[in-house]
A protein has these predicted regions:
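Bacterial N-terminal signal peptides
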Residues: 10-19
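Bacterial N-terminal signal peptides that target proteins for export
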Residues: 1-10
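Juxtamembrane cytosolic interface motif at the C-terminal end of transmembrane helices
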Residues: 19-25
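Conserved beta-strand/short-helix segments
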Residues: 25-553
């Protein structure tokens, strides 16, 4: 489990307009015609970039700070380290008095061929130093409801719309819900855990529960899932004892529902095999209707290498840190565990579930395995592969599971076409709403290539980052594109966040370490005067475009 303390970045690519008609062969990394075209259509920066704001992502393995609406017409980007003391909507962006209070920037466009414009600058109603508002952003399908987490927010209050001004529990965490009417945004709710944790003394997990470490919205925006990876209860299952604090960083997830404009907590969800430090709730994902819920525990230590359907647990232990994904379903207001998902080659410290994503129908779940050690390439590689290296290599992998009826099974296992040690392939990923496009990032990948399908075997730009775009036809997955930033440089960490529209035709990618001082849309990419300001790159995929050789930037 090497390099977990590294840093991440988000970049959404811009204005390169590179058209490509090649597909990268799943086994060899060679290319074949017929994948359509992918082009970079926007380069997006904060309207107030500052050094270390990390526009698009707060840090390595921390949060999904970029979100797209289902139609791809609204985009939200978090900058968790932004330092303005402004409150709520469109306040003073030039203030820098509250370090790492965090901010979110909302962008909109009229159509998928129209230019992007910033619509709102969004701040917490109670900005606090170090709260990191914007750590996670989530959007409803129409983009009119937005959830934003501040997982280091320090209020001790519980439930909905409580006292925001208390700061007695560092890292307690909070989630804020905003709604849009026309083009106007307003805050609808301030949401806290029903068992906001106790103040600790060690400055890390021993402080608060980190409610809001992960979050997800249903398509209609009426169901919200929130992970608190440092919750300390020893409860198991649904709605157990929330007030116990004997199991450090076991983790939990919370389900909230909205009726009209009022939010209430529906469920408190714990792993069936709760254990200390497994971090259940590290990543969460809801189906479109909100009735299927995937949640990970990326340090879970189960020994299984198969999916276990229909069992309530607990599950056998024996491989520390392999990680697991749990799938729950809802009938009415009642939640039930449906399946326990494990990778077919699970080994100690692989970390399955560092990120999870789910299709709209809930029948496809993708999970990242960033510390997996196998050096094979492609989809379902046939070459022998050692995933139990004496030295942890963190090459990384991803896996897709599918559901037929109520039965889950592993469908595909993904490796980069250019696997490299400590690339962290699978550190971020997202599956499209239709389930047929999968974007997987390797945010520490080292190639100096720029644009689409460039040279993959170059290692001269350390931790520049890359994104790999896969497509599914029937049950078969292939890699379509190898994607790099248009201004790719070392330590930019392109791929620290990824987001896809429902049809997979719009992709946004964050690079938290990008250094340009540009503001707004399509500014100067070549400037490097504001270190780790961050950027986001937007790409457009056209599956029917005629293939042609990639343009050279």
């Amino acid at each position: 489990m090497s390099n977990r303390a590294g840093q991440a970045a988000i970049i959404v690519a811009a204005m390169v307009a590179v058209a490509v008609g090649v597909r990268i062969d799943a086994q060899s990394g060679s290319t074949a015609s017929g994948a359509g075209s992918l082009r970079q259509t926007a380069y997006v920066k904060a309207s107030n970039p500052h050094m270390g704001d990390h526009f698009g992502n707060g840090g390595t393995l921390l949060g999904d700070s970029v979100a797209l609406s289902g139609d791809g017409l609204t985009m939200a980007v978090g900058a968790p380290n932004e330092g303005s003391g402004a409150k709520t909507i469109n306040g003073n962006q030039d203030d820098t008095s509250v370090y790492a209070a965090g901010a979110v920037y909302v962008y909109a466009r009229r159509s998928t061929t129209s230019p992007w414009a910033q619509q709102a600058y969004v701040k917490a109603s109670n900005p606090m130093a170090g709260a990191e508002f914007g750590h996670v952003v989530a959007l409803s399908a129409d983009g009119n409801t937005m959830a934003v987490s501040a997982y280091f927010e320090a209020s001790a209050t519980k439930g909905i719309n409580g006292n925001q001004n208390d700061d007695s529990i560092p890292q307690a965490g909070a989630v804020y819900v905003f709604t849009r009417r026309g083009s106007m945004w307003s805050q609808q709710a301030y949401i806290k855990a029903s068992n906001t944790g106790e103040a600790g003394t060690d400055g890390n997990f021993g402080d608060g529960d980190q409610f809001g470490f992960s979050a997800s919205l249903s398509d209609d925006g009426n169901t919200l899932a929130v992970g608190a990876n440092a919750d300390d209860s020893n409860a198991t299952g649904i709605n157990g004892n929330q007030n116990d604090n004997s199991m450090q960083s076991a983790g939990a997830a919370y389900i909230f529902v909205r009726n009209g404009t009022a939010w209430t907590q529906q469920a408190y969800v714990k792993s069936p095999n709760t254990a200390a430090n497994v971090q259940f709730g590290y990543s969460v994902a809801l189906s479109a209707d909100g009735n299927t819920f995937a949640v990970s525990a990326f340090d879970e230590g189960g020994s299984s290498r198969t999916v276990i359907n229909g069992a309530s647990g607990p599950f056998p232990a024996g491989r520390n840190g392999t990680g697991a994904i749990y799938v729950y379903t809802r009938s009415g207001s009642t939640w039930t565990l449906q399946s326990y998902l494990k990778a077919s080659n699970a080994e100690v410290n692989d970390s399955l579930g560092v990120i999870v994503s789910i299709s709209d129908d809930g029948n496809t779940v993708a999970g990242g395995i960033l510390d997996e050690d196998c050096t094979a390439a492609g989809v379902n590689p046939s070459a022998p592969c050692d995933n139990d290296m004496k030295e942890d290599t963190s090459v990384g992998a991803a896996v897709v599971f599918v559901r037929q009826g109520v039965q889950w099974a592993q469908q595909a296992y993904f490796k980069a076409s250019n696997p490299g040690k400590e690339d962290w392939f699978g550190s971020r990923l997202q599956i499209s709403g239709d389930g047929n496009t999968l974007a997987v990032s390797a945010q520490l990948e080292d190639s100096a290539a720029q644009g689409i399908n460039g040279k993959q075997d170059d290692d001269s730009a350390q931790e520049a980052g890359a994104v790999y775009l896969f497509g599914r036809v029937g049950t078969q997955w292939t890699q379509r594109f190898y994607v790099k930033a248009s201004n790719n440089e070392a330590f930019d960490e392109f791929g620290s966040s990824v987001a896809l529209s429902r049809d997979g035709r719009t992709m946004a990618v964050g690079a938290r370490g990008e250094d340009s001082s540009a503001k707004g849309i399509d500014g100067n990419q070549g400037d490097n005067s504001v270190k780790e300001a961050g950027a986001v790159y937007v790409f457009t995929y056209n599956p029917s475009a005629a293939g042609r050789t990639p343009a050279t930037k």
